[in-house]
Each structure stands twice: as C-alpha cells, then as structure tokens.
Amino acid sequence: MYSLPHLSIPVSHKFIFESLMSNQRQTQYVDGNTLTVENLVQFSTGKFILNLTPAAWAGVAASRKIVQNILDSGEVAYGINTGFGLFSKVVISPDKLEILQDNLIRSHCAGVGTPLTRNRTRMLLALRINVLSKGHSGISTLTLQRVVNAFNADCISVVPSQGTVGASGDLAPLSHLALGLMGEGPMWDPETGQIGEASDIMKRNKCVPIKLKAKEGLAMIN
C-alpha cells in the first residue's frame, strides 16, 4: 500500500492525510500556499473533496472586488476591458466583456493528440483551483465555487496531451480544461469512465457550468 511520508503542516490548514487506498473521501483545504506534491498525488485519485480555507475565500472575494471597482469606474485595464496581445489597446464595450472571455477560451482550444488520463487531468484541475485560491486572479467566488464543485463531482474535462509550449502559462491545456467547465466540448463521465458531452455530464451530476465574467477567462488560463 502506498502511504504518504510524514509532512509537517499547520493544523489550521486542516489537511487530513490518508493513504491512497482509502475509500473514504476526505475534505482537503487549499489556500494557494501550502499544497505539496504528496497532496497533488492524492487529488489525482478522485478520492478527495477540495475546498478553500476561509481566509482563501476572503482573498478571492477581495480580489474580485478590485476588478469590479475598475469596471464600475470605467478605467481601462488590460485583460479586464481590453483585448489581448496585439489588441491590448482596444477597449471592449461592457456588453461584450463576457463573450470576449468565452471566445478567449474557445480560441485557445488548439490541443491535439491522445487525451491526458483522468488522474493527470484531476491534478491539472486541482492545481488551477490552488492557483486561483491565492486571491490574485480576479475570479469571482461564484465561478471558483462552480469549478470546485465540478472537481468534487469528478466532472473532469478532456484535455489533449499535445499542443502547448508553456510560454505564457499552458494556454491550450488550460483552455480545454475551462471549456468543459463551461459545459462545452468533451468530458470524462464519472460513472462510466468514458468520454461524453460536457453539457450532459454536468447536468446529470448537478453541476452548473461556469459563466465567465470580465477577467475570468484570463484567470482560468494565465
């Protein structure tokens, strides 16, 4: 039986370590700072439920408030109400901000090849949740909660194994990861282990697809 080495983790972080052979799902708390490789291996098994620490949730909310303040003020800020790359100086009208974020994800779904295994993709999703829990991205608590809910329901997007160089974040893999959470594209069915439509699988597992608001598409992939 594989067992984890002793790890010195503050009790306040509420980490409860179990062997990978345990059938009981334990809740593990992430905060963007204390995740270990051992935790990540655990999360790959699908036997753990994720949540953020209260402090991490507060940080996420505070970060989103900054984004909202920028939107309310009409201030121009890159990635919030502008285009990207060569279009960074193009100001996007408020009524187009959500579709901009959706299209950012769709346009970067350029991966090819055999899909990553479910275990590896679980780790990818857990890593993204951990990064977002730092409270630096501007994602809303509502969107992040839906991402966490999908992980806990084992609704895992299908992510191709090839198609990125990792130059500015792993844009293609993370876009495929986000696309499934939007209820689009393919997803692993937690009941059968087969690939199906994300919209159907999320609905059957009572998961609400994420609806990206200003800045949130960028937060999901960069």
Pin down the residues of each PLM region.
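Conserved, well-structured ligand/cofactor-binding cores
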Residues: 9-222
